[in-house]
């Protein structure tokens, strides 16, 4: 059946333009009217006929010309062979015929390999995948790079083909190789906004911390190109997907990675990529996709899930095995509590002035860090709810926590004021004690300043939390 022509010219060199004159290669499925050779043709005319047969996808004529003695690896003006042209348009049947006739699957022209050409082809992923399977079955090397040091997996990631990426890795492709600009396959996927490819690469062990030559990580590249969901996911400290399939054999890897050919898996995984939130991504990484509906029915968000205890997980119908996976992930996500240091026992009345001063200084410094953290949150918080990229719980939950924070800060402020009054009282008593030898005034003044600064800092933190609370209420 005939199909319309592909309007662009096939260009050699991995998408780089050529200054050579037009070779007339409009690759595509043109008029597929059966043609037969009327008799022996001169060499030049035979090559021109061969080119037209390839252009039109006339497989029977291609086979007849090959039978007449024309070389299957005949190169044309750009130096491309017939196999490269067939791969560039993902003509699976033509690729199969040429390979069966002895075409060189490892051929390259200026480091542009047939496999790279197939990976960067314009066509459906299904056809591209089949062409690449054929080339890999003929020992095409998935790690040979082009002049820009881009490997086939980078082209597949750039063009958004997760199954092709998986197939290449199953045949030995290196996931973390870098091109001339320091881009990895993950960087390319993040740059182009291909979330499904990002997920697949992380599952295959891609390192999200590798930097480009200008010092950018994949998450920063995603942010720069306004792919905020990918940026948020890659910014998570935990990568539960990483290396998930490393322990499988080659056959198991191919089977597992390509099982998405079934309609059921496509519906469950690929169709849901467009609607993935942070909860789905987290569960997918742990292999707990089956829990998504359960958690959504119970209105449990990721942030709620991350704060649940083991008994709460059990009450919500989560099995022991799934609980273990979640708790292990939560353990990796735990944030270290701020440690102020331990004071000597006050009851012994042996606390030194230096130790007490160090405690106050440390407390004051930590309060300053907390104030800065809240200021950053207020600055970064989206002004409008429609700008929030990932799934959020009800703002009422956030407001409730802010209310508790304000209450705690008020309590802290009250206690610090009591401490200040107590120290002031002690200071006054010592000054009025005729037996006391007064210390240097500078020390007394310094202690007073520290106490005042601590009290002011705590009060300021309370005001900031109050502002934060009002901000959430407005949203």
Curated annotation (Swiss-Prot):
Region listing for Disordered, in residue ranges: 1-24
Superkingdom of source: Eukaryota
PROSITE patterns in UniProt: ANK_REP_REGION, ANK_REPEAT
Transmembrane segments: none
Keyword Cytoplasm: yes
Modified residues (Phosphoserine): 17-18, 20
Chief subcellular location: cytoplasm
Function in brief: Plays a central role during spermatogenesis by repressing transposable elements and preventing their mobilization, which is essential for the germline integrity. Acts via the piRNA metabolic process, which mediates the repression of transposable elements during meiosis by forming complexes composed of piRNAs and Piwi proteins and governs the methylation and subsequent repression of transposons. Its association with pi-bodies suggests a participation in the primary piRNAs metabolic process.
A Pfam match: Ank_4
Name under which the protein is recorded: Ankyrin repeat, SAM and basic leucine zipper domain-containing protein 1
Subunit structure: Interacts with DDX4, PIWIL1, RANBP9 and TDRD1.
Domain SAM residue range list: 272-334
GO terms, biological process: cell differentiation; male meiotic nuclear division; regulatory ncRNA-mediated gene silencing; spermatogenesis; transposable element silencing
Compartments where found: Cytoplasm
Keyword annotations of the record: ANK repeat, Cytoplasm, Developmental protein, Differentiation, Meiosis, Phosphoprotein, Repeat, RNA-mediated gene silencing, Spermatogenesis
ANK repeats: 45-74, 78-107, 110-144, 148-177, 181-210, 214-243
Protein's organism: Ovis aries (Sheep)
Matching PANTHER family: ANKYRIN REPEAT, SAM AND BASIC LEUCINE ZIPPER DOMAIN-CONTAINING PROTEIN 1
UniProt keyword Endoplasmic reticulum present: no
GO cellular component terms, A-Z: pi-body
Name of the gene this protein is made from: ASZ1
